[in-house]
């Protein structure tokens, strides 16, 4: 999942990070965040 496609902000809240974290949780990781336009999951 690339964060560039999901990137938008509402009142300072970056929704792409939440979508990335949800994606990572869905594949069994402990969450994640966007780094340089790429969703990086935590182990």
Curated annotation (Swiss-Prot):
Coiled coil: none annotated. This is Defensin-A. It is found in: Secreted. InterPro entries: Defensin_insect, Defensin_invertebrate/fungal, Scorpion_toxin-like, Scorpion_toxin-like_sf. GO terms for biological process: defense response to bacterium; humoral immune response; innate immune response. GO terms for cellular component: extracellular space. Antibacterial protein. Strong activity against the Gram-positive bacteria M.luteus, B.megaterium and S.aureus. Reduced activity against Gram-positive bacterium B.subtilis and weak activity against Gram-negative bacterium X.japonicus. No detectable activity against the Gram-negative bacteria E.asbriae, E.coli, P.aeruginosa and S.marcescens. Pfam families: Defensin_2. Disulfide bonds join 3-34, 20-39, 24-41. Its main location: secreted. Gene3D superfamilies: Knottin, scorpion toxin-like (3.30.30.10). Keywords: Antibiotic, Antimicrobial, Defensin, Disulfide bond, Immunity, Innate immunity, Secreted. Belongs to the invertebrate defensin family. Type 1 subfamily. PANTHER family: DEFENSIN.
